[in-house]
Curated annotation (Swiss-Prot):
This is Mycofactocin precursor peptide peptidase. The keyword Metal-binding applies. Keywords: Hydrolase, Iron, Metal-binding, Protease, Zinc. The keyword Glycosyltransferase does not apply. It comes from Mycobacterium tuberculosis (strain ATCC 25618 / H37Rv).
């Protein structure tokens, strides 16, 4: 596929390209993209959340290397993405692979315990809202155990919930060849608080036959560039401040 997520690109600061012998002397901090594999309507790929989280994490890591920030004095590496999450609300749609909140919580806890044996700090960059329950429990526990972990969201103020204007715009910026514009159409555009009671009973399929919440037909690459830059700026600011809440979210 024509995307930075699928195409292997040599980038300074990628954990996957380091060797074990390089790490003990540096005690790096690591940025871990956390996404999902789930339906994103008829027009976006199943790994949309993972692509966005990976691109944000990669750009944040590069910014931490380049900018004159106190926390940038540490070595920062981007880890390979965790591409499966808690996506049960999308389970009625083909292609969705959800490991659930309990399994994801344990995965993140054991991941953090292992990585903290040699890494100074851990920050998870989350691309899927359904992962928040697992993140808060796992990172909160890691912090209670004395490990310096945190997480930050890939969010956009005022964005629509799922596979609509926001995510489609970002994918038009990151992976334009993989957005099937001939298949997009508006989904349920009601506010998320209005939809949640029905979604709790029957998932996304109960409120949208296409799996879309929002309107992707208004998306543009220019808007995606702006949204993506805002996501990166927000994450860099949170990491630079490094002020985790009790649940581990960086503020």
């Amino acid at each position: 596929m024509n995307s930075s997520y699928h195409r292997r690109v040599p980038v300074v600061g990628e954990l996957g390209s380091a060797t074990s012998s390089q790490l003990p002397s540096t005690s790096p901090s690591i940025v871990i993209p956390l996404g999902s594999t789930e339906q994103h309507g008829p027009h976006l790929p199943l790994d949309t959340d993972t692509r966005i989280a990976t691109a944000v994490a990669r750009t944040v890591t590069a910014r931490l290397h380049a900018e004159d920030l106190p926390i940038a004095q540490e070595e920062w590496l981007m880890a390979p993405a965790i591409a499966y999450g808690a996506s049960g609300e999308h389970q009625r749609f083909a292609g969705t692979i959800s490991i659930g909140t309990e399994a994801l919580t344990m995965l993140l806890v054991e991941y953090g315990r292992s990585a903290a044996c040699w890494a100074r700090r851990l920050v998870f960059v989350n691309g899927h809202g359904g992962n928040v329950g697992a993140l808060t429990r796992a990172v909160g526990l890691l912090r209670a155990e004395g490990r310096d972990a945190g997480w930050c969201p890939c969010t956009c103020p005022g964005g629509d919930p799922h596979a609509g204007h926001t995510e489609t715009s970002v994918l038009l910026h990151l992976s334009p060849a993989d957005v099937r514009t001939e298949r997009w159409r508006a989904g349920n555009r009601a506010p998320l608080p209005v939809l949640l009671p029905s979604m709790r009973r029957g998932g996304v399929a109960a409120v949208s036959e296409t799996g879309v919440l929002g309107d992707p037909t208004t998306a543009t690459a220019a808007e995606g560039r702006r949204i993506f830059a805002a996501m990166v700026d927000d994450c860099v600011r949170r990491v630079a401040r490094w002020m985790p809440q009790p649940d581990g979210m960086l503020t």
